[in-house]
Amino acid sequence: MLEMTVDSIRVSPMNYQRVVILKEKESDRYLPIWIGPAEADAIAVKLQDLSVPRPLTHDLLATVIDSMGGTIDHILVNDLQNDTFFAKISIKTNEESKEIDCRPSDAVALAVRAKVPIFANEEVMDKAGIHLDQETGKPLGRETSSDDNLTKEQTEVKPEELKSMSAFTDFIDS
């Protein structure tokens, strides 16, 4: 598991879609995850330390977990299948520890409220992690070392991979 931090939430000026950018704590790899506007707002409100007159859904869930004697231990972005990310919330109670399946956007919104670590599996970062140019914020090509011994087929970018990244690249370019 790789520890991550919330780097930013970005909004596309063309279609107003939101993406949360998680940064690997010990390197310069980033994990962009497209999220809905409500989840983006819930994360941003907490990161900016803003107060809202009534609890948001993620505040409510954190309160329910706490009032039932549980604590959120960490969240984990654990899988990526068909361009869909999966996450788990690790909740501890006196008797046991449970992992609850959820969307990464909800998991991150809970993590920033509970001030708990955010992790991503190495496999997820290998599939979807990117490097960003620090000046432009645009994605850089993947780097491979000479001892990786990867075949051309393993390193060649397939058309379907380009298509799935095109929305993110268009977003960064806008």
Predicted regions and their residues:
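Divalent-cation
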Residues: M1-S174
